[in-house]
Amino acid sequence: MADKWWGEQLLGRGDDGDLWAVSAAPVTRGELRAGVAGLRLRFRESGISEGSSVLLRMTPSFTYLQVLLALWSCGAQVVLVDFRLKPAEFEPLVERVRPQYLVVAAGAGGPVTGFRQESDFEVRRLAGGRPAEDGVVLVQFSSGSTGRPKVIGRPAGSVLAELDRHAGLPGTPGPGERVLLLNSVMHNMGLMTGVLHALAAGATLVVPPTFRPAEVLRLMARTEVSVMYGTPVHYDLLARTADRPERLSLRLAVSGGERVPEETRQRFLAAFGLPICQVYGVTEIGLIAGDLSGRCIPPEIGPPVPGVELEIDGEELLVRMDRSPYLYGEHTDRYRDGWLRTFDRVGRDPETGVLSILGRSDSLVVVGGLKVDLTEVEAALLDHPRVAEVVVTHQDAIEAFVGGDEDLTADELTAWCRERLSAVKIPKRFFVTRQLPRNSMGKLARDRALMHRHITSERSAQSRPAELKGAS
């Protein structure tokens, strides 16, 4: 690279012959650097330079990662958009950020069958696009689990500071280790915790070309994976797979994004002899807390990582930031006087400093003049042996959307809740389905209207009643 850029040390680490990543085939660090250099030249010829704004929407692949690094090396601000979004979801995002360029896969849209070694793309220049926001190199959208996604911008210093926090977390992957990544490379945990930390640490990234559990396990054995990152859904599927290799080199399994259900945690522990360790962060700043020792049990998430400054106001977690992460002057209520409101309620052990997630500050509702924590209702229902996942909402009444055994009845769920919750906390309506909808990050969707649309759609497909009336 002729010109210096903020991530040059990441890309420059290691010898050309060192293994960078493995999927269907291996890729060396020399091949990575050569690929980025060639793409950078192509982007320069297209007019992309310092201060350009580029929206990136491609098939998950090693090409995608090389494109991202090449755009950054040009000095561009990159807006990441999930390939799986439908046009009705994607087009409003383009209107909101108004990029100067699109880098998109040919025929973008539709299902993704897995991770590819290579993928084709095209570069389009858009009229009337606005240049990069001052200092911002990475733009992401919040998960949108509770409504309209937020537009979040991170400067280079924020990205590098998060990588430093990962490096300071005891037990984190180090040089020469093989790191399996099941999280999406389009989102923060997959990109930062997986791709960029492995690049910075000198570890080798392993990304399965298919997410069929038995094939993932064989890849883990063949490549001698010692660390894996995934979501609770991934861990549950792997733990249920009977066809497991006799010998695995796995020493660490890490999850983030949402709480690991106790049943999944126990099943994985029994199958692999390892606990699932938790890390916690938010898109606005990245990694905040974590424990890779396996000693913390949900709802514990571990102590704050070195380099992050926290306060707990009442029970709400606040994080110190130099600037608002929200672009275009939005969400002024979420950042004030140097502190970001996470809207997560936490407790802190006075002796160990370990944080525990208590719920969301916006999950507290008033029913009959009494405060009800909807996460407490969810926790009670999740203890039911035939319930796999739950979202509890409140508008005119408390409603529970339950994923699990479709033979569950309202009477059974109501009786279960009555043994564990006071009457005011018991849902008035239950909606039971085999599986609840999730957003593109794999998190449970928490939008009530979306849940009702899902139930209605499923009812139409199956011609069976969807609503089960519960406690009166």
Swiss-Prot record:
Catalysed conversion reaction: 3-hydroxy-4-methylanthranilate + ATP + H(+) = 3-hydroxy-4-methylanthranilyl-5'-AMP + diphosphate
Keyword ATP-binding: yes
Entry keyword set: Antibiotic biosynthesis, ATP-binding, Cytoplasm, Nucleotide-binding, Transferase
UniProt EC number: 2.7.7.97
Enzyme type, top EC level: transferase
Matches recorded under InterPro entries: AMP-bd_C, AMP-bd_C_sf, AMP-binding_CS, AMP-dep_synth/lig_dom, ANL_N_sf
Functional description taken from the UniProt entry: Involved in the biosynthesis of actinomycin. Activates 4-methyl-3-hydroxyanthranilic acid (4-MHA), the precursor of the chromophoric moiety of the actinomycin, as adenylate. Can also use other benzene carboxylic acids, such as 4-methyl-3-hydroxybenzoic acid (4-MHB) or 3-hydroxyanthranilic acid (3-HA), but not pyridine, quinoline, or quinoxaline carboxylic acids.
Protein name, UniProt field: 3-hydroxy-4-methylanthranilate adenylyltransferase
